[in-house]
Structure formats: C-alpha cells, structure tokens
Swiss-Prot record:
This is Adenosylhomocysteinase. Adenosylhomocysteine is a competitive inhibitor of S-adenosyl-L-methionine-dependent methyl transferase reactions; therefore adenosylhomocysteinase may play a key role in the control of methylations via regulation of the intracellular concentration of adenosylhomocysteine. Keywords: Hydrolase, NAD, One-carbon metabolism, Stress response. Substrate binds at T64, D139, E205, K235, D239. Its cofactor is NAD(+). The gene is SAHH. NAD(+) binds at residues 206-208, 240, 269-274, 292, 327, 348-350, 397. It catalyses: S-adenosyl-L-homocysteine + H2O = L-homocysteine + adenosine.
C-alpha cells in the first residue's frame, strides 16, 4: 500500500489528512480541557513527578478532541505516545492535526479504508528498533489482537516455516490482518514477539474489547496483563449510559434531520448503552420498543414503561432501529427488506457486524445512494423501497457526529490514566499477572470525586459513629466490590 509516513519539523512521525486544521483543533482542545476536570487534575497531581518518564505508550482509540486531551495528559506525565483511531470513521481531522503537530505521533483520518486502518494500527505499534510500546491504551482490542495474532504466526513460522494464509478466513477484515502479518514475517520474523516481551500491559476501554480479553484469559492465551477500564463504575455507568443518551440523538439528527417525536424506535439490547439510547429516544418523544435476550434487562425495560418484543414482531412497523448489543447478526438483510420505506438503521456498538452489511451490499440488484458522507439510502429492487443506513453500520455517534461530550469522557479517560499509571508503577513488582483486572473501588470513587466540583456538588461527610455503624472507612470506599449502582 502506497502510504508514506510524514514528519514534522521536529522529526515526529505522522499521517493525517489536513495539517492546516491544527490551529482549529488546538482551540477546541482548549475548550475541552475546561470540561475535563479529571484529566486536568491528573496533570496537576502527577505532572511534577513525571511518572511516565521513559514509557512508550501506543493508543488505539477514537482520535477525537476529547482523546487529544487524554493524549496530552499522558505526555504531560512524561510519556512518549503514538496513536491511531479504533474506527475508520471516528477521527476528527482538526484533533488529529493538532496532536500530530504539537504532542504525539498520530496516524488517523476520517474515512480510512480497512487496509489503511490496519496500516495505521501497525504504525502506532511501531517504535522502531526498540520493539514496540511499553503500554497500550486500547478501545475494541484491535492493537491487542494484532500483537496476539502476530505472535501466534511467528511461533508457527519458527516451528515449521508456515506463513499465515489470508484465504483461510471468510472475514475480509481478518484477511487484511493476516496479510499484514504474513508480509511482515518475511522481513522481521520476531517483531511481534519482541513487542510481547516488552509490553507491561494494556488498559481496555470498551465492552467489546473486554470480552476479547476475558476470552483470551479463559483460553490461556493472554500474553500480558490487562486492566478492564470498561467495568469501572465511572466508565460504564456514565460513558455508556449518559454518553450514549447524549450522542445517539445528535448523530441521528445530524445525519437525517429526522424528527424523533412520534416515531417508533427499536433499541436492540438494554444494557448500559441500550438504556442510554432508549432514554434519549423516549425523552425525544419516540415510542420505544426494546429487544432483549436477558430476562432481567427485559424486566428493567418494562419497568421504565418500554415495550419488549422481538425484532420480527416490529420490523415492518418501526421508523428507527438502533443496535447496542455488542453481538453479531442482529439486523439481517431479510429484516431490512421488510422495513418500511426510509426506515433508519444504525449501530452504536463497537463493531460493524451487528447489522448485516455484507448481506445488504451483496443483495442482488440493491442500489446504494449516498446522500452525504456516512448517510446512505439502500433501495431493494423487488420492493422499490429503501432504508437509510448510517455510518455503514459502524458507530453512528462518531461516524455521523462527534461522539460523547467532553465531561463524560473525562470520567472514562481519567480511569485510563489511572490504569496506565497502575500498570507502569507496578511493572517490577509482579502484582499484575497475565490476567484481566478491574480498578479497585477507591480509585473508582476518586474518579467520581474529581468531577463533582465542576458540577457544584458537595459531599456529605460521615461521622465516625456513622462510619462504624455501616462498617465503612470515613474516607471510603463506601460500597463493596459487588455493589450494583
């Protein structure tokens, strides 16, 4: 692939779309900093001691304005950083330009092809002769996946000379991954093994990536320690819930200008993300129907006044369909053929396999009409009616809008900084094995406390008698690890 890495005047590598947007990006970063008190508190608390001095951090996470504040927090604490996005549509060009010019090596632009996406991931992991990063900030697990698949291929190559065969899988994206690994083996047959040996650990941002980590842990194939940031309360109950409540309608309205009030909306899945999406649609005046496999989540939905049905029950009646499950094959092409004309179909789960885009793209005679970037109308020849698909079935809130607002991302990203610090500071103690860990409750509470002042909140203080009565320390943590918020 004929992509060339560029360099700034100071010699920092990058590949972004438009460096002329760097000044614009810097202005928005400065606005976001005011809305991200957790990250700014990390800079104030840890910046003087430079705890990341000597650390090389690779990030694979949406290259947005909010992520820019995270990156510059890591560099303010002493780290060197290389970054790529974890989604082909989520990069904000001005954010990428500002960071590439001022702070870190960035390889990201909006509208990457899948080949370009994995090239960017490979570049973000490439630290030259040193072998790779010390730490990874991951979102969805693609950087982690590339290293694991690379190590597996190198072991096979060393054992019997076998190269990865891209034709061994029907998954077009995984074919690209295997091609990258195969081509790299010829010139450097131990690249990913050296990365594995150097790596201290990874902190994972989202549900889908965490699922991958737990699968590898169960299989005994996890190569380095991992911290599950997603299941911190101040991430999952805020980013996943309140963030989606904000960004779903933002993406819908930017993409389609549709009036949500009066529409019938189907939300597939009623976890934290689904709860936020359903609340947003209900508050906007839609009649919301939930599909669920879990009786507990289904019961929660009914207690919120929502109807719980199957997709087959409502596929021909609804106006808006949103997938939030983190699973695959939720809305198939046969479902889409039965939808009413101009029904809107979108996904807010991490990957693009909740909606059967391959089935849609290969349906005989189907016609794709691009209305604007990331908004396409697909017309079926046998019905002459069409559906509107947002962001090609990928994350619509980042593909069609700018994702979650700065404040809620400050909660998530403060967890990321704390997780990275924890891994780095304990790198020589043996505290973290090749397992998946969750941050302790007192750190979760610390993240929350850092954000209260911005909102004008003031905590009540326990007396010693009160603390003794409920058997908690006066300064916390206030809830047991198993408590459900």
């Amino acid at each position: 692939m004929a992509l060339l890495v560029e360099k700034t005047s100071s010699g920092r590598e990058y590949k972004v779309k438009d460096m002329s947007q760097a000044d614009f990006g810097r202005l928005e970063i400065e606005l976001a900093e005011v809305e991200m008190p957790g990250l700014m508190s990390c800079r104030a608390e840890f910046g003087p001691s430079q705890p990341f001095k000597g650390a090389k951090i690779t990030g694979s996470l949406h290259m947005t304005i909010q992520t820019a504040v995270l990156i510059e927090t890591l560099t303010a604490l002493g780290a060197e950083v290389r970054w790529c996005s974890c989604n082909i549509f989520s990069t904000q060009e001005h954010a990428a330009a500002a960071i590439a010019r001022d702070s870190a090596a960035v390889f990201a632009w909006k509208g990457e092809t899948l080949q370009e996406y994995w090239w960017c991931t490979e570049r973000a992991l490439d630290w030259g002769p040193d072998g790779g990063p010390d730490l990874i900030v991951d979102d969805g697990g693609d950087a982690t996946l590339l290293i694991h698949e690379g190590v597996k291929a190198e072991e096979e190559y060393k054992k019997n000379g076998a190269l990865p065969d891209p034709s061994s899988t029907d998954n077009a994206e995984f074919q690209i991954v295997l091609t990258i690994i195969r081509d790299g083996l010829k010139s450097d047959p131990t690249k990913y093994t050296r990365m594995k040996e150097r790596l201290v650990g990874v902190s994972e941002e989202t549900t889908t990536g965490v699922k991958r980590l737990y699968q590898m842990q169960a299989n005994g194939t996890l190569l380095f320690p991992a911290i599950n940031v997603n299941d911190s309360v101040t991430k999952s109950k805020f980013d996943n819930l309140y963030g989606c409540r904000h960004s779903l309608p933002d993406g819908l309205m930017r993409a389609t200008d549709v009036m949500i009030a009066g529409k019938v909306a189907v939300v597939a899945g009623y976890g934290d993300v689904g709860k936020g999406c359903a609340a947003a649609l209900k508050q906007a005046g839609a009649r919301v129907i939930v599909t669920e496999i879990d009786p507990i989540c289904a019961l929660q939905a009914t207690m919120e006044g929502l109807q719980v049905l199957t997709l087959e029950d409502v596929v021909s009646e609804a106006d808006i369909f949103v997938t939030t499950t983190g699973n695959k094959d939720i809305i198939m092409v046969d479902h889409m053929r039965k939808m009413k004309n101009n029904a809107i179909v979108c996904n807010i789960g991490h990957f693009d396999n909740e909606i059967d885009m391959l089935g849609l793209e290969t349906y005989p005679g189907v016609k794709r009409i691009t209305i604007k970037p990331q908004t396409d109308r697909w017309v079926f020849p046998d019905t002459n009616s069409g559906i509107i698909v947002l962001a090609e079935g990928r994350l619509m809130n980042l593909g069609c809008a700018t994702g979650h607002p700065s404040f809620v991302m400050s909660c998530s990203f403060t967890n990321q900084v704390i997780a990275q610090l924890e891994l780095w500071n304990e790198r020589k103690t043996g505290k973290y094995e090749k397992k998946v860990y969750v941050l302790p409750k007192h750190l979760d509470e610390k993240v929350a406390a850092l954000h209260l002042g911005k909102l004008g909140a003031k905590l009540t203080k326990l007396t010693k008698d009160q603390a003794d009565y409920i058997s908690v320390p006066i300064e916390g943590p206030y809830k047991p690890a198993h408590y459900r918020y």
